[in-house]
């Protein structure tokens, strides 16, 4: 009986010796990967990219958040540059495209209707309406326009704001982003940043 008790005690000690390193390894990995790695990565990103890590937020003169440079939103009134149409109503919680194929007659009819509306609003020929002003982006939240799509809105915005067209064209040019690393994508205008510049210009007058 005594020998059996000693054997059982030794077996329990061996089990404990086997489990203890596994538990310590699991706890250490959890601490390292779940806490220290995340905290270190977050701190590094905030130090290196303070604006982007907070969502590229746009603020007014009082510091109030008015939007994000990454997410398009509608602007009411003719004194603003308008972004692309959105199947999601510019709602980040419902980001999506229309899922209509190019062969869908409903898509062709919608684009034709939008083209006529933009042409009348901007006082240009339908053939001069840039495609991105009448087509939706894949996620419905794209804040960018082609330079041509921004330029066709200059006359309207300048008239409403009492600015000269050359002055406004210079503002558009200043907010035109080049190709990514000079290779990827196309030149584009961030409508959110451009409209923020309009607010700052109006405040400075």
Task: Describe these PLM feature segments.
Residues 156-205:
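Extracytoplasmic/periplasmic C-terminal soluble domains
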Residues 2-17, 21, 25-26, 33-34, ...:
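Flexible, solvent-exposed loop/hinge segments and secondary-structure transition points
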């Amino acid at each position: 009986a005594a020998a059996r008790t000693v054997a059982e005690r030794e077996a329990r000690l061996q089990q404990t010796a086997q489990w203890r390193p596994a538990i310590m390894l699991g706890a250490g990995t959890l601490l390292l990967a779940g806490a220290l790695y995340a905290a270190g990565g977050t701190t590094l990103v905030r130090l290196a990219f303070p604006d982007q890590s907070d969502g590229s937020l746009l603020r007014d003169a009082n510091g109030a958040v008015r939007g994000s440079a990454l997410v398009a939103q509608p602007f009411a009134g003719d004194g603003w540059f308008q972004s692309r149409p959105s199947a999601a109503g510019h709602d980040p919680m419902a980001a999506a495209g229309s899922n209509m194929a190019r062969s869908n007659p409903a898509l062709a009819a919608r684009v034709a209707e939008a083209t006529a509306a933009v042409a009348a609003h901007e006082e240009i020929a339908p053939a001069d309406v840039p495609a991105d002003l009448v087509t939706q982006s894949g996620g419905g939240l794209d804040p960018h326009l082609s330079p041509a799509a921004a330029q066709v809105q200059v006359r309207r915005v300048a008239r409403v704001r009492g600015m000269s067209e050359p002055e406004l064209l210079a503002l558009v040019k200043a907010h035109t982003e080049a190709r990514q690393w000079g290779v990827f994508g196309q030149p584009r205008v961030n409508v959110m940043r451009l409209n923020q510049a309009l607010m700052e210009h109006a405040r400075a007058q």
